């Protein structure tokens, strides 16, 4: 299950990237922010989408995951 703080509940556009792969949704592993799906256009000013370094308690190490959050939130 994807933690809510990664933005899984925020609507996003699922688009194909220039490399032919689909963008990655919140919680997916990533290597750069350009891989991550962006919030729907109506929310693009309110929300930011990026590849973020997160602690994985299950794996016991840091991993890079796509994240979408409200830019006015202290969690962003």
From Swiss-Prot:
Domain of life assignment:
Eukaryota
The record's note on its domains: The presence of a 'disulfide through disulfide knot' structurally defines this protein as a knottin.
Instruction: Please give the tissue specificity annotation from the record for this chain.
Output: Expressed by the venom gland.
Tell me where in or outside the cell this protein is found.
Answer: Secreted
Q: What is this protein called?
A: U1-cyrtautoxin-As1b
Q: Which cysteine-cysteine pairs are annotated as disulfide bonds in the entry?
A: 23-37, 30-51, 36-66, 69-76
Q: Which UniProt keywords apply?
A: Disulfide bond, Ion channel impairing toxin, Knottin, Neurotoxin, Secreted, Toxin
- Where is it mainly found? secreted
Mind listing the GO molecular function terms for this protein? ion channel regulator activity; toxin activity
Family the UniProt entry places it in: Belongs to the neurotoxin 21 family.
Instruction: Give the CC-aspect GO terms.
Output: extracellular region
What does the UniProt record say this protein does?
Neurotoxin with probable ion channel impairing activity. Is both paralytic and lethal, when injected into lepidopteran larvae.
């Amino acid at each position: 299950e994807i933690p809510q703080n990664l933005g899984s509940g925020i609507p996003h556009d699922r688009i194909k990237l220039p490399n032919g792969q689909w963008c990655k949704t919140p919680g997916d592993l990533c290597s750069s922010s350009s891989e991550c799906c962006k919030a729907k256009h109506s929310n693009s000013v309110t929300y930011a989408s990026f590849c973020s370094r997160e602690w994985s308690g299950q794996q016991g190490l840091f991993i890079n995951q796509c994240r979408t959050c409200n830019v006015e939130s202290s969690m962003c």
